[in-house]
């Protein structure tokens, strides 16, 4: 794979890749990156998103017919912090798709609520061990190498991880254990576990 060497090339390649990944994430004609994904103008008029709707948004719609999934996504995108996380999640999943890596194909067990709460409090090592993705060691190795070799990919991943950390702290304050279990199996949480493992974030 060619390494992206500039920000303009990054955005150009994203545009090409989105056409490939959006059918998989169901983020195609119904979500326009230039409008819906970047529109924060009405965020102050929006009611706070429920935990249930946020979790649904973090998983992205199941398919083009998932009107409820698109409803949740639009509500979450209108919120500044959650919208930033969703855009960052979309970006990293788009770049991962370049190497044929899709969150639906990832073999990973949902982590227990206690593990997420411990991580949000700053715990690392054995207490958050179930966040490590060990069943996909070849994928983890590929991503680790790309993090080392590709500056734009690394910056995009770090941007996503920072937003995830911030949103997780708030989610853990509001979510029940059953809600955190559902959250753990979302595409966004799967991406976090994969990228966190590859970057050594859980050590």
Please place each PLM-identified region on the residue numbering:
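Generic, well-ordered alpha-helical scaffold segments in large soluble proteins
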Residues: 13, 17-20, 76, 92-95, ...
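C-terminal tails and terminal domains of large nucleic-acid-associated
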Residues: 164, 174-203
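A structural signal for well-ordered alpha-helices, especially hydrophobic packing surfaces
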Residues: 18, 100, 168, 192, ...
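Structured extramembrane domains adjacent to transmembrane segments
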Residues: 39-178, 182
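Long amphipathic alpha-helical coiled-coil
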Residues: 1-32
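Generic signature of intrinsically disordered, low-complexity segments enriched in small/polar residues
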Residues: 13, 25-27, 105, 122, ...
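Cytosol-facing regions at membranes
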Residues: 32-42, 54, 58, 196-203
């Amino acid at each position: 794979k060619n390494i992206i060497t500039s920000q303009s090339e990054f955005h150009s390649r994203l545009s090409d890749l989105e056409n490939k990944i959006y059918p998989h994430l169901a983020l195609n004609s119904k979500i326009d990156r230039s409008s819906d994904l970047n529109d924060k103008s009405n965020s102050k008029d929006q009611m706070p998103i429920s935990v249930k709707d946020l979790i649904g948004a973090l998983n992205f719609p199941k398919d083009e017919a998932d009107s409820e999934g698109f409803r949740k996504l639009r509500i979450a995108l209108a919120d500044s912090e959650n919208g930033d996380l969703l855009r960052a999640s979309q970006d990293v999943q788009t770049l991962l798709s370049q190497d044929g890596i899709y969150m639906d194909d990832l073999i990973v067990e949902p982590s227990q609520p206690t593990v997420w709460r411990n991580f949000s409090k700053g715990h690392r090592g054995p207490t958050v061990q179930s966040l490590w993705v060990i069943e996909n060691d070849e994928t983890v190795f590929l991503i680790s190498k790309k993090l080392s070799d590709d500056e734009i990919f690394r910056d995009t991943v770090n941007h996503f991880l920072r937003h995830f950390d911030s949103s997780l702290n708030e989610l853990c304050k509001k979510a029940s254990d059953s809600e955190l279990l559902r959250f753990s199996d979302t595409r966004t949480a799967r991406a976090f576990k994969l990228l966190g493992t590859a970057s050594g974030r859980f050590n």
